[in-house]
Curated annotation (Swiss-Prot):
Cited NCBIfam families: eIF_5A, PRK03999.1
Stated family: Belongs to the eIF-5A family.
UniProt-recorded name of the protein: Translation initiation factor 5A
Annotated function: Functions by promoting the formation of the first peptide bond.
Keyword RNA-binding carried by entry: no
Record localization: Cytoplasm
Residue numbers of Hypusine PTMs: 38
PROSITE patterns on file: IF5A_HYPUSINE
A GO term for molecular function: ribosome binding
Top-level division of the source organism's lineage: Archaea
Length: 144
């Protein structure tokens, strides 16, 4: 996954940011900026939700500071097979659905995570859009 650097003041609601601490991509839910003080600079308070895990974070930075923004690669593909896996987590074992997706341009097969809200729509033969966020994630399913 490629990242570019932008200033915090250039970000808008709906943009994506890359958090280096946990290596996840977050979607910005809200941004509030404060006025600069007599000797200070304007600050931005960013609330964001992880695209893969749903974790919520709050970042407070000066608007002139740099922040990493991911260049999201979108892949059109077709589901070949799905598989349920048990993954350890802090709440115990969690069941995760992974889909084998064939890229319709290169015919390469990749494994992509399937979010909770799309688990019932995913079936072999369905066309999908996969976002490469460091970890491939199915973001949209098209029924035939």
């Amino acid at each position: 996954m490629e990242v570019i650097v932008k200033k915090v003041g250039e970000l808008k609601v709906g943009n994506y940011i890359y958090n280096e601490q946990d290596g996840e991509v977050y979607k910005i839910v809200s941004i509030e900026t404060s006025k600069p003080g007599k000797h200070g600079s304007a600050k931005a308070r960013i609330e964001a939700i992880s695209v893969t895990s749903g974790k919520k974070i709050v970042i407070i930075k000066p608007t002139s500071d740099p922040i990493k923004v991911p260049q999201i690669k979108k892949i059109k593909g077709q589901i070949i097979a799905t598989e349920k896996r048990k993954v350890p987590s802090p709440q115990g074992e969690v069941e995760e659905v992974v889909a084998q997706v064939m890229d319709l341009e290169t015919y390469e097969v990749i494994e992509a995570k399937v979010p909770e809200e799309l688990k019932d729509k995913v079936e072999p033969g369905a066309n999908v859009i996969v976002w490469d966020l460091g970890v491939p994630v199915v973001m949209q399913v098209f029924k035939q």
